[in-house]
Amino acid sequence: MLNNTPLILSFILLIAFSCSKTEPIGKPNTPTLNIDFVKTLGGSLNERGESIINTNDEGYAILGYAQSNDGDLINKPDNSFDYWLLKFDKNHNLEWQRTYGGSDDDRGAHFIQTNDNGYALIGYSKSNDRDLTENNGANDFWVCKLNVSGDILWKKSFGFLGADNGNAIIQTQDNGFLITGVLDVSASNGQGNSKATGTKRHAGGDYWAIKLSNSGEKQWSKFFGGTFTDTPFDVIQTKDKGYILIGSSDSEDVDIQDNKGSYDFWVINISETGMLLWEKSFGGSQIDEAHAICDSGDGNYLIVGDTRSNDFDVSSNNGAADLWLIKMSPEGDLIWEQNYGGVSFDAGRSISKTQDGNFLISGSSRSLDGDLSENKGQNDAWLLKINPEGTLLWHKTIGGSNIDFAYDAIELNDKSIITIGESSSNDGDISTNKGFSDLLIIKTK
């Protein structure tokens, strides 16, 4: 009879070493992600990049706001805040820049390239001079339609006596626009719906959706929320011509039926004409805020933001706040959720699909443990790539010893990545600071 003992022992040892716990499990095999350049643009005061898009000529454009009227700013008449739009070619050369606004506080939040190769911008304005022809009181939604060269074709203000802030714009299937942001319902005394809707009592800030024609004429408007603070940050049109709006809510009444505690991700689905079809709250007992939504490519949606919870819908939390990602069905059912971060404050601000079918997330991090292995000091810009199942493929922190944030990121045609935000650093990855805070542009590949 053959003695098989040595063979059996060898097989057992092979299995043991193959399953060694010294190998990291669940950590991404981080590839070398090279920083091609880091640029800061601005003047002696405060600048910030909020939104970036690919343009039809293979370049890109950035919208934010600027306070300075020196340094990199051109033809800006004073040091009030204005919308700041910058257009770059495919070789990263600045082709042109424009500021839009008046003599008060005007800040760009989001923009798109339109079907006619122009641009549509949204944010808020407190001005009633220069580029502004009206102000209804405090902050108004301010929408600007531009041609391909950045000239204003039309502009519209929407609001009442309170702080009404525009946060997102999309071009709709009928070639018009849907804009959303916060309506101060208390200050508007219940105004803001294009039709009377009964006796339900709203208060505080509500989601406000306004449908515009291609020429900027209001077709309808509707607000949604409760009696506390409800803030939308993003919107997407559905296949049936309705809309999904996402943001945060700490209300637990009127339109909100299932608040988990404090602020939740609050998602609403409205019809083509603004009728509320359903609403869902996702989160835990602490503060959870959704900031961006994208189509997952399989008929569902991915929503990113941050969470301070570790109960109810949030299965785990690494620390003070984690970047939180959920996958949701078209009916508003939670499919899965995933958190990323360390023991400090980590947040997600944008999500977009990449050419290889994965997803790019931008945000910020103060951690140097958990999913993070590096922190340059205070807040760093944080860039992550995940697969469709939410597995972290790689991530990169970029910053200096002061406060640096990423608010948006896109993949270019050559698969390089441009991330934008703001920076107060002048060391580490960021060599120059022009003023208090600068518009930050990072190219990685």
Where are these regions (language model features)?
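Bacterial Sec-dependent N-terminal signal peptides
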Residues: 1-32
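A sequence-level/structural motif corresponding to short, flexible coil/turn segments enriched
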Residues: 20-445
